[in-house]
Amino acid sequence: MAELRPSGAPGPTAPPAPGPTAPPAFASLFPPGLHAIYGECRRLYPDQPNPLQVTAIVKYWLGGPDPLDYVSMYRNVGSPSANIPEHWHYISFGLSDLYGDNRVHEFTGTDGPSGFGFELTFRLKRETGESAPPTWPAELMQGLARYVFQSENTFCSGDHVSWHSPLDNSESRIQHMLLTEDPQMQPVQTPFGVVTFLQIVGVCTEELHSAQQWNGQGILELLRTVPIAGGPWLITDMRRGETIFEIDPHLQERVDKGIETDGSNLSGVSAKCAWDDLSRPPEDDEDSRSICIGTQPRRLSGKDTEQIRETLRRGLEINSKPVLPPINPQRQNGLAHDRAPSRKDSLESDSSTAIIPHELIRTRQLESVHLKFNQESGALIPLCLRGRLLHGRHFTYKSITGDMAITFVSTGVEGAFATEEHPYAAHGPWLQILLTEEFVEKMLEDLEDLTSPEEFKLPKEYSWPEKKLKVSILPDVVFDSPLH
């Protein structure tokens, strides 16, 4: 729960911001990390010393539910001559270390990141006649902050967030987010490390899909060229009713060319998925490592979890902590990170140590496998094949309903335990599937209807008997079984 008050209002939950000429004695009573970020805000908004602020009534470090202590809201006049409209500018306080006493973040020194190393910002177009900023963006930022604290995954510029609901709970088409550097806020050196500022940018579903298929930075650049869709400062307009591709159809050609040239930076997603070993009789479950719908999933060993974390760090941090909390209780939202690929794609860890399977969990070669996805996850298979495998990369689905993962690898990926001789291999509940370029092209032809969800009827099955591979697209309810 939060309350709205001027940031300079007295009280234990919202300490007053110091003036530009505050004496050192007063500044010393102010949390140093908070003081440093306020200094950057004062540089940008010298005429707004006490902006409205949404404040967590019970602080996170006192057991409250909201990780952000404060969200300040400023009025930005923009620049009409540069196609930058007047807007509200929201700035968070709490993802970085505000206090330096380990109450929230462990102090690790002044040279590295402060806390998680960043704060969130958001720019919302001001509506005509609007005298005060809406407060819903503060709750949106709290939701993203909860994800960061729960998962310990950080955000980077170019990342995207699949939210699956209008950001303001209206009927808006703006239902997802990209992240980018704030165009005005400069990195701040605090006594507890460096803080950068990442801006949330609201986007339509079609724009999110393009970011997944290509990369977030490319779509952000396109949004900057369309004033109504964001313009130079990427200001979110919740009343925008058209995608950038409807506004300028030529932009789709730039995306298609980018995918063909660059491939996709997205290397993994949290998903509703499962796999079965069809080469093993159903009753023969001794030493079985596959996760079957309707059966109790086996859990990853600690070593397996660490291996998957390390080897897929470039694009997917796999863990057993909650995924992004839903803005709408009826929906479960997922987060997908969009990272730039390294020079050589590999399933090795950062230390260049190849995967060495734990001796107690042997790697098994499988003769035949059955992959199962919900419709949203299945719709990403063409992206996996065209944007990743055809560019010599890998792509991972990490289950959000069990401790298992499915990694597709191309023949050029190093460190994989699936090989051309044994293309299906499992290490515990982690399945790897190696696909040749020829087979990828064949699958893309056969899976073409996955790109037209409006014409899709579930369940849907695809089969390649000569490859002993089957893929099923199933209703969400199949994956929501309490036993799965």
Swiss-Prot record:
Biased composition (Pro residues): 12-23
Pathological condition linked to this protein in its record: Medulloblastoma: Malignant, invasive embryonal tumor of the cerebellum with a preferential manifestation in children. Joubert syndrome 32: A form of Joubert syndrome, a disorder presenting with cerebellar ataxia, oculomotor apraxia, hypotonia, neonatal breathing abnormalities and psychomotor delay. Neuroradiologically, it is characterized by cerebellar vermian hypoplasia/aplasia, thickened and reoriented superior cerebellar peduncles, and an abnormally large interpeduncular fossa, giving the appearance of a molar tooth on transaxial slices (molar tooth sign). Additional variable features include retinal dystrophy, renal disease, liver fibrosis, and polydactyly. JBTS32 inheritance is autosomal recessive.
Subunit structure: May form homodimers. Part of a DNA-bound corepressor complex containing SAP18, GLI1 and SIN3. Part of a complex containing CTNNB1. Binds BTRC, GLI2, GLI3, SAP18 and STK36. Binds both free and DNA-bound GLI1. Interacts with KIF7. Interacts with GLI3FL and this interaction regulates the formation of either repressor or activator forms of GLI3. Its association with GLI3FL is regulated by Hh signaling and dissociation of the SUFU-GLI3 interaction requires the presence of the ciliary motor KIF3A. Interacts with ULK3; inactivating the protein kinase activity of ULK3. Interacts with RAB23.
Molecular function in Gene Ontology: beta-catenin binding; protein kinase binding; transcription corepressor activity
Cross-link Glycyl lysine isopeptide (Lys-Gly) (interchain with G-Cter in SUMO2) per UniProt, renumbered positions: 321
Region (Disordered): 1-24, 279-360
Name of the protein in its database record: Suppressor of fused homolog
One Gene Ontology CC term in the entry: ciliary tip
Record PTM Phosphothreonine, positions in chain: 353
Coiled coil is among the record's keywords: no
Outcome of swapping residue 152 to A: No effect on down-regulation of GLI1 activity
Location in the cell: Cytoplasm; Nucleus
Organism, scientific name: Homo sapiens (Human)
